[in-house]
Amino acid sequence: MMIYRLNALTDNYIFLLHDPQTGTAAVVDPAEPEPVLAKLAELGATLRAIFNTHHHWDHVGANCALRSRFPDIAVYGSSEDQGRIPEQTVFLKAGDRVPFGQTYFDVLFVPGHTRGHIAYYAPTTGDLFCGDTLFGGGCGRLFEGSPAQMLDSLNQLRQLPEETRVWCAHEYTQKNLSFALTVEADNPTLQERYAQVCRDRAQGKATIPSTIGLEKATNPFLRCEVRSIQIAVGATTPLQTFTRLRGKRDQY
């Protein structure tokens, strides 16, 4: 499976998946149709599916245009998002398995950012498409879910193999890591990552994908059990730590 990262809107990423052996393609969270159509034409590929992680407009904005162009495609999304994802044809729940080309995706239910948010994990290739749940150095805002839900979702993703590639849907890494340094300034791995990300962004390079291992070492939202971070935010439990981190990040 080939993965192509496409820029969209201001800071969104669309991911186009291509199986060269069959010539089929799928797209994850298409915000706009134009970059998707251009890449399909370049590859000579046929779009077979849309994989939506949640219902927000900047993740489903191209659904109607793409299904108009390719009326036979399947549009996947959470069963909790029924009626909120345009053109949705398949309603997924935790534990479902979705085939694509020579591989498949396990569906993970990761509410918090929204009440129906899901992620797509391909264990055979080690790829995770997590939408707005886990970001490089951060996590999504809580629009519909609770801190406890989001912490549970992040802990679920934290259990994936450390080499898992994390394909999140926004380029927020630099600001997220800048915030992370305010609560864990003495973390050398975090310092090194932030310096590298600053160099990459100065050259217009993407910081996605990261890995689960890197996030566990540098992302404060996956480190809520670390005592120094708890002390930095005046908390004593992982949930209290997460809640205070999220509040501070919202104001950063």
Swiss-Prot record:
Binding residues for Zn(2+) 2: 58-59, 132, 170
Keyword Calcium in record: no
GO molecular function list: hydroxyacylglutathione hydrolase activity; metal ion binding
Co-factor requirement: Zn(2+)
UniProt catalytic activity: an S-(2-hydroxyacyl)glutathione + H2O = a 2-hydroxy carboxylate + glutathione + H(+)
One Pfam assignment: HAGH_C
Keywords: Hydrolase, Metal-binding, Zinc
Chain sites annotated for binding Zn(2+) 1: 54, 56, 113, 132
Domain of life, per lineage: Bacteria
Pathway(s) where this gene product acts: Secondary metabolite metabolism; methylglyoxal degradation; (R)-lactate from methylglyoxal: step 2/2
Phosphoprotein recorded as keyword: no
Cofactor details (free text): Binds 2 Zn(2+) ions per subunit.
EC number from the UniProt entry: 3.1.2.6
GO biological process: methylglyoxal catabolic process to D-lactate via S-lactoyl-glutathione
Transmembrane segments: none
Recorded family membership: Belongs to the metallo-beta-lactamase superfamily. Glyoxalase II family.
Function noted in UniProt: Thiolesterase that catalyzes the hydrolysis of S-D-lactoyl-glutathione to form glutathione and D-lactic acid.
Description of how the protein assembles with itself and partners: Monomer.
HAMAP family: Glyoxalase_2
Name the UniProt record assigns to this protein: Hydroxyacylglutathione hydrolase
